[in-house]
Amino acid sequence: MSLRVVRSVRAVACSLRIALASCPPRPWAPSAAAVRSLRTGSALLSVRKFTEKHEWVTAKDGIGTVGISNFAQEALGDVVYCSLPEVGTKLKKQEEFGALESVKAASELYSPLSGEVTEVNEALAENPGLVNKSCYEDGWLIKMTLSDPSELDELMSEEAYEKYVKSIEE
């Protein structure tokens, strides 16, 4: 037991570079070839951005996934029908592309970015309530190519959107 404690203390001291003597080799340490670097940049992160009309978008590899925010789905109530565009539809930023109908109201959908629709969430035809149950995951609406990825910079971050929602609730 004491030998194990000594090895642990020595390993900690070496990892903190406190040891006076040279550190013994660590067989559990990854080799230089096995170490992977993690880069973080706006092109690599899939961050959710929001519009003032309560749509959200995440972008990865030039494809944007679009849906409505939790605030919007709560305001709508139980979604019973989704009217979505066809694949191949070209959209401009803030252009109307469909509508959601609920037991309380109907709400138009607006494209957060410019691009072309590449996929429509077919599951919503059978189960439009996915928008309520999982608005950020299974309840997404469309996927689209981004014709101008710089438009993402004009949208609100999650924190800014939360502040925006609080300001309109007051």
From Swiss-Prot:
Q: Its Gene Ontology biological processes?
A: glycine decarboxylation via glycine cleavage system
The cofactors it requires, by name, are: (R)-lipoate
Q: Where in the cell is it found?
A: Mitochondrion
What keywords does the record list, in alphabetical order? Answer: Lipoyl, Mitochondrion, Transit peptide
* CDD domains listed in its UniProt record: GCS_H
For this chain's record, the cofactor binding note is: Binds 1 lipoyl cofactor covalently.
Subunit and partners: The glycine cleavage system is composed of four proteins: P (GLDC), T (GCST), L (DLD) and H (GCSH). Interacts with GLDC.
HAMAP family, alphabetized: GcvH
Q: What is this protein called?
A: Glycine cleavage system H protein, mitochondrial
Q: What is the scientific name of the source organism?
A: Rattus norvegicus
Q: What high-level taxonomic lineage is stated for the organism?
A: Eukaryota, Metazoa, Chordata, Craniata, Vertebrata
The primary gene name is Gcsh
